[in-house]
Every structure is written in C-alpha cells, then in structure tokens.
Amino acid sequence: IILLVSLLCLIGIYAYAKNWEKISEAAEDEKNKPLQAHYSIPMLSHETLPLLKYAEEGDALIEVPLLSQKDSGYKTGCELVSAAMVLQYYGETITPQQLYEAIDKVDTPVNADGIGVSPHKYFIGNPEKSNGYGCYAEPLINAINKLLQRERYAVNIKDTDLATIERTYLAQDTPVILWATIQMKPPKEGNRWTLEDGTQFQWLAGEHCLVLVGADEDYYYFNDPDYGDGVIGYEKELVQQRYDELGRQAIVISR
C-alpha cells in the first residue's frame, strides 16, 4: 500500500510539473504577444480595414523605392527599413543593415542592474527577432547622419501637424519618415520599466514606422515596410490619431 501511494504521488508530481511547464510556456507566449509589434504578413482588405485604400494610377505620390521588412529580414526593424527607403529615394545606397550597424543599440530594455533605457536614445532589441522593440526618432536621426556625413542630414520635425507636413514637405516631393501603428490599429500597453532618472517608461505595443509619400483630400499614402506590395492609404483622421498617440514623431532628409 505504501509503495502504491508513493507511486501515485510521484505520478501526481510529474503530471503537475508537466502541466506547470505548459502553463509557463503559454504565459511567456502571451507576455510576448504585445511586443511582436512590428512585423506580420498583413492580409489587407476593406473587410478587415475599412479605412484603408490602395493607391491607384494617377494618385499624386512621391516615387520612393518600396522595401519590405520581410525581404530585409528585419521583423522588428520598421524604422531601419523606412529610413533606407527614403535614403535610396535621394540616391544613397544605404541599406537597413548599414543603419542597424550605425545606430546606438542595446539588446534588452533593462540592464543587469535593473535600469532601463529609452527608445529615444537607443534601438532596443534585435530587429531580426519577433520580440524586438525598435526605436523612436532620435537614435534613427543619429544613425542616418553618421552615414550621410553631412552631404545631407536628417531633421527632426517632431510635433509638426500633418496638415503642415502635407503643405511643406509632400508638396515639395519630400517623403517623411513617420511614427504611427501597424495597420493604424490602436496601440496597446506594452512592458514598463524604470529609466536611469527614475521615471517610468511604457512601451506602446503596435508601434510602427512608415514613409509618408502622398495625400489627397481624404487619405494619407504610405510606403509601409510591413506591406511590400504597393502604396496604401489610410483615412486622414485615423492617421492623425495614431500619429498623436506615438508622440507626433517624424523625420525628413534635407535636400
């Protein structure tokens, strides 16, 4: 009887351990879901995205080379791919890989001492991995300017409203690197960490970087590195909302 009870206990412990392993794996997957923010193979349609429009022949668009994250191998490197598109528009041969080499970067958002870093200073994570983060405008500007070596230079036009961007830049055939969200869906609360100055930072899952290449009365048009099959447009009001939520961040290259 004692042996039977012991055997049943061992079986129970093993079953519990296996079940806990499955629970832990599921929890880890769920934890990472909000962070897989940059890369997908979008099934873009008017049924799933009623505010989307495909660019048509005759639309007034800046002809920026279209690159994709998939082809670049950068699942979470939308910022790098978007910047490369704009640089190639100006005749530069700079690649997303060169931009990643040049950018200030860290592997994880929090170091061994528990101190976090800001995406305003660093590219966070590995762009080849689906659980990477990315960066905001400032480190991308620094990387671009390292590579351009003053022949041209990146300019931070943060807080410029979209109507002004349309009049000032698009009208002069100047494409704009712009922060919004994937497929213009609402951002979600991502991981939170403490910065060196003691302030709390929260990553917005769904953060995305695109190239603004045109506008009409109702839509803004983008080269979207997450979608490599053509220029797509989103309703202006929706783009404005996502642009605001991501801190009204935008970059242009001086001519």
Model-inferred region functions:
Residues 135-148, 178-180:
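A structural motif
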Residues 192-204, 210-255:
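Noncatalytic regulatory segments and standalone regulatory/sensor domains
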Residues 168-176, 180-188:
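Short, solvent-exposed, low-complexity loop/linker segments
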Residues 82, 159-161, 180-184, 214-216, ...:
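A mature extracytoplasmic/lumenal domain signature
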Residues 149-153, 171-177, 216-219:
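Loop/turn elements at helix/coil->beta-strand transitions in domains of secreted/extracellular proteins
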Residues 2-139, 182, 190-193, 200-203:
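Active-site-adjacent structural segments surrounding the nucleophilic cysteine of cysteine proteases
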Residues 161-168:
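Surface-exposed ligand/attachment interfaces on beta-rich extracellular proteins
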Residues 86, 177-179, 211, 221:
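Soluble periplasmic/extracytoplasmic beta-strand elements of cell-envelope proteins
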